[in-house]
Amino acid sequence: MVDNGHVTIAMADLGTVVEIAQVRCQQEAQRKFAEQLDELWGGEPAYTPTVEDQASWFQQLYYGWIGDYIYKAAAGNITEADLPPPTRSTRTYHIGRKLSRQAHADIDASRRWQGYIGCEVVYKSEAEAKGVLRWVGHLQQSDYPRSLVAGVEWRMPPRHRRLAVLGSAAALHNGVVHGERLFWPHEDNYLCSCEPVEQLYVKSKYNLIPPRPPPSPDLLRTLFKVHWYHVWAQILPKLLSDVTALMLPVLLEYFVKYLNADNATWGWGLGLALTIFLTNVIQSCSAHKYDHISIRTAALFETSSMALLFEKCFTVSRRSLQRPDMSVGRIMNMVGNDVDNIGSLNWYVMYFWSAPLQLVLCLLLLIRLVGWLRVPGMAVLFVTLPLQAVISKHVQDVSERMASVVDLRIKRTNELLSGVRIVKFMGWEPVFLARIQDARSRELRCLRDVHVANVFFMFVNDATPTLVIAVVFILYHVSGKVLKPEVVFPTIALLNTMRVSFFMIPIIISSILQCFVSAKRVTAFIECPDTHSQVQDIASIDVPDAAAIFKGASIHTYLPVKLPRCKSRLTAMQRSTLWFRRRGVPETEWYEVDSPDASASSLAVHSTTVHMGSTQTVITDSDGAAGEDEKGEVEEGDREYYQLVSKELLRNVSLTIPKGKLTMVIGSTGSGKSTLLGALMGEYSVESGELWAERSIAYVPQQAWIMNATLRGNILFFDEERAEDLQDVIRCCQLEADLAQFCGGLDTEIGEMGVNLSGGQKARVSLARAVYANRDVYLLDDPLSALDAHVGQRIVQDVILGRLRGKTRVLATHQIHLLPLADYIVVLQHGSIVFAGDFAAFSATALEETLRGELKGSKDVESCSSDVDTESATAETAPYVAKAKGLNAEQETSLAGGEDPLRSDVEAGRLMTTEEKATGKVPWSTYVAYLKSCGGLEAWGCLLATFALTECVTAASSVWLSIWSTGSLMWSADTYLYVYLFIVFLEIFGSPLRFFLCYYLIRIGSRNMHRDLLESIGVARMSFFDTTPVGRVLNRFTKDMSILDNTLNDGYLYLLEYFFSMCSTVIIMVVVQPFVLVAIVPCVYSYYKLMQVYNASNRETRRIKSIAHSPVFTLLEESLQGQRTIATYGKLHLVLQEALGRLDVVYSALYMQNVSNRWLGVRLEFLSCVVTFMVAFIGVIGKMEGASSQNIGLISLSLTMSMTLTETLNWLVRQVAMVEANMNSVERVLHYTQEVEHEHVPEMGELVAQLVRSESGRGANVTETVVIESAGAASSALHPVQAGSLVLEGVQMRYREGLPLVLRGVSFQIAPREKVGIVGRTGSGKSTLLLTFMRMVEVCGGVIHVNGREMSAYGLRDVRRHFSMIPQDPVLFDGTVRQNVDPFLEASSAEVWAALELVGLRERVASESEGIDSRVLEGGSNYSVGQRQLMCMARALLKRGSGFILMDEATANIDPALDRQIQATVMSAFSAYTVITIAHRLHTVAQYDKIIVMDHGVVAEMGSPRELVMNHQSMFHSMVESLGSRGSKDFYELLMGRRIVQPAVLSD
């Protein structure tokens, strides 16, 4: 029996004890996780009262407290520091922490049923049907995907299950439903089923418990729980605003009666005018207070949601991020767009009850005016409601589909920006741009559907109140009654009120539906399991000499496997009544469809070795990150389903890592070295066995993670600065020479991902960060592979054996000559430990000779061994070594591992450019450029004419009713009626035309702006990407494009709507009562001055807000990439504090926009109230002067129109400000379109357009085949594939005008088919040479001949097509193995397998169930760094049409044996190609035809390896001798051809 609270639950059998224990462990883990969250958020920062806190009630009412900020902002000299900070209750820390607590409480509550797993259950209606609860969760392929179901292993199944025929959808199963492995039964039988949890009882000792199904987590519900006060505070001002708005038609009725009365006194009329004035003022103040609270609540929703997303990015498990639908692009989209949609709900949430209330009150008032004649009009109203429901459902479906397409577009854009170097190296720009444009085209199709639905919405909502009033007046006429002014004008006023309510309906519904879609997406991410480290604290056990202990541990990761596609059995009619039907058996709803992927996927799931509870199912759209390669087979919007399947990485690990010692982990590429280190940090799942480790860990990854900060910031990493320690760290990490040449010293910005550092410098900065952290355990993942020989020697002596002496050091390396230095050695092979012991024991095994044969030849010095000292270079090498140590480092940084293009570019060491911020008004050129992109000025002229004509028709209906009611034309009643019906007809069918035309033009503009932006970024020079953070560029494609797609189109539409409405109102007022100009003229002047101040202020605030978003995106992307490093160093709380500070700035800017709008609105509307009072007052004077009945009718019409002027002006001002503020996004997009320096690729636009056209109706695979045909066919005919020749004559190169030369008169010649190695110290110009070959940088002197032609005679893409580039930093993209090695899909499967075999990856890929079609996760996270590099090599080997192969230290992260095998393969299989290799491992180029030694940008030496090494005065000879006796011996053996690895043979 198990005690569950106060109830004793019956365990089913002894086998469930483990499951019960697992549940208890989960509960304990939840408690510990709550403590981790408290530590993550830390204490509340100090608070200083703000200006808003100290404002009086009158200042709060009329927003006087913000006046100083508005005038300062209008002057155009504000920065983020000038923004008033948020109040204590609205700070991101405060609201984010509250939301975090509530969200985790809701998630824990939703998992309450997990506590019953392993308990005995009974079917609700059959007491004899008993079984054991094995699983609780949600079925993916179900018509009720959010319904909680229970997986039960039955002893006696329910009757409806027993009657099912085996093989049918309702049959019992063995834990697999629709190909989805839900759980593993204890008995290997088919006695399992999934039942709705409400159909089960949990059996206790005394009775049956009917546990209530917990509610599913819902971010919206959680937000309302947290911010309930701000939500409820909107009710009172909204109610007061609505009531006073409805009082105005009543007051108008009495005023019209006063004007028509024969004996009315002037005092009564003046009292009515004053009452109308005061009612208007109260309505204005209460409406703006409501807007203030609602928009503030929206800002709180946004910032607290972003804070929660940041927290989740820090705590989400690695397993969750393996899900295809949780890509970086999707997370960025959630922060950029989804939280905005969630926040916007608060702008309109009160209209849920306000709009119906207003309509009901309007109907009651109409009944009061016209009696029973209102009933047919009400029928018209109710007829339109079902139509609105149908349109709403369509909009929701389209919005969900569009959200997934936007995810796909952003993911593809992020991949392009993150891997832009390899994209340019390989000439893939058209492919990537076409894929993004394809996603954009699908997004625009969805946007078109939304726009069409909105036009229908507006048609219905515009037509409904007009038809209602028309029906009323027709029946009024038919009944024989005479229209009178006291009936007509209050009715018109009520009609205008109804128009506002109906006008809000499409906005409300659209906002709500978008909010629901976004909340669902964010909730899915928040629900992802958090990381719960299975590494136990070694301090809990008494093992003083151990730093970590593995005890029979099995280390696993999770990979997604596609499930077979199934379709619903329900008919369309059944689906439409889905929520009204009884929820039946889940499995009966769906059936498996025949598809090429179904059987394979199902087989993959069933054949994969998984453990109990080790699977997790996920869902994604076919347009989303997952399965995009299959979109040719899946209709747009169809879903694809995946299951996360456990994969064993390390098996049965039993290992004790000694404390305070140096442990070296060696093994071939992919053997599991990095996995072992990751397991110590808790990065992987421990499926069996146990693992203990110390908590104080510093981690140096194989690919250094560098923050976009200064050098000082990267080393300190949020620690306090200790000057003495910092200098010592810089010294021992060999950074002194680099610092001496950095113009800003320690304060030099080193760029995003360390873009202006070489690979070795990034490794040393990463190492310096670890050393400065002063931890107990150091995990070093092969940091020496990126270092020069002599630098690596000093690092070993000064850091690993020096400053870190006495610390626990675990070094993963390929360099076997370092093993004598190790206190403990661990050897890995194929995921298993084959040896663990000291060097003496290792030397006595056969492994020692085997590994020496496999791993020998590493580039670092052997001098660290017991028989050779650290300075064991020969006498001849000493001068060179000394010279190498003192090399001028002015060129030591690089683009992707070479030299720095921006060494002296910006003063004080600043590399990253400050984001541009325009000042003053948005220039007219921006408006003109935008209007041109939207179809041209002629099209907008037609649009304005359409708006003017339709507004004239709309105003004519009110004017005609006024004429009809006074009978001034002396026509018959039927004639009045027919003319009125004709006007109504034109009004109803004319209004949708302007909406449709406006949406169409705006959509064209969005398409063209995105296309131009994408093409501009696609051909931008590398210097742009080196100085611009990816987050800043991505902000243009997310936030700014979202504004152009959604916000700006509505802004222009409503701006024109309200502008022409205001014009018609003012014209009618002036024509009817010219004396009203006495009030209008000064009010218009005041309007103008206030608008000037406000627009300038709002514009500057909006610009700050736009800029404030970019650092948020940048920090989020850095956090996702460096999560492992940040968490290991225990700095998550500090990064979160930085994020909260940036979110406070975003909130402040958004809040200031809101309050500034209120500041302006209350002032403008007060002036409007004055105008209304003047109209009424003039009417009173006219009454006293004996005005005619005709004039009285026109005065009544003028007053009726003036009452709408207040709200019209309020919305007009808001839309003017919103449009001008949102035009900042157009300005920002145009800046990247027009101001970015471009490469000369004039054919790019046509290539992309051709590929996008060819994509129509075709799958991705077909498209990418077309890419190579269209982009390469013509060029191939002109320049057939041949071995390349290269001649450089006096080549000079500088990265920018005014900077020093990086290449100084370089001259050499490379013959066809030659194998050339380029060597030299970091900063000598090696990588710059390769960049010059690829024309990533342009030469400023000299000539380069490629295949006998000057390089300048080639087009840029033609030049790059001649070269296959293998960069230093491996970059893989989300997709399949085939797509990564052959993006153009022009190679056969046999050729792909052969290339993988040549680089040593065949066995690794063959181990996947889908082979070369197996999935590569985003960034290649399911492959080791070395394997990623091998994948890049296979990619280059398969590139066709090239005559050169360029390798930039491409084998730095693989073991030497595999490196030699690859080099031998290159020598034979590519004998017809010219190979140019940059290498620090001298043995890599020992068998090459020619060696070029670079030094300070010049060719210091050139010749064959044999010639150079035999010249004892040469620099190359000194470099070889600096390897030490054993290293130089290995080199000479390779040189003499005695140790050549036999290459694999490329099969046909």
Curated annotation (Swiss-Prot):
Enzyme class of the recorded protein, top EC level: translocase
Limits of the ABC transporter domain: 634-855, 1286-1521
GO cellular component, one term: membrane
Subcellular location: Membrane
SUPFAM superfamilies: ABC transporter transmembrane region, P-loop containing nucleoside triphosphate hydrolases
InterPro entries for this protein: AAA+_ATPase, ABC1_TM_dom, ABC1_TM_sf, ABC_transporter-like_ATP-bd, ABC_transporter-like_CS, ABC_transporter_C-like, ABCC_6TM_D1, ABCC_6TM_D2
Name of the protein this chain belongs to: Multidrug resistance protein
Source organism per UniProt: Leishmania tarentolae
Annotated gene: PGPA
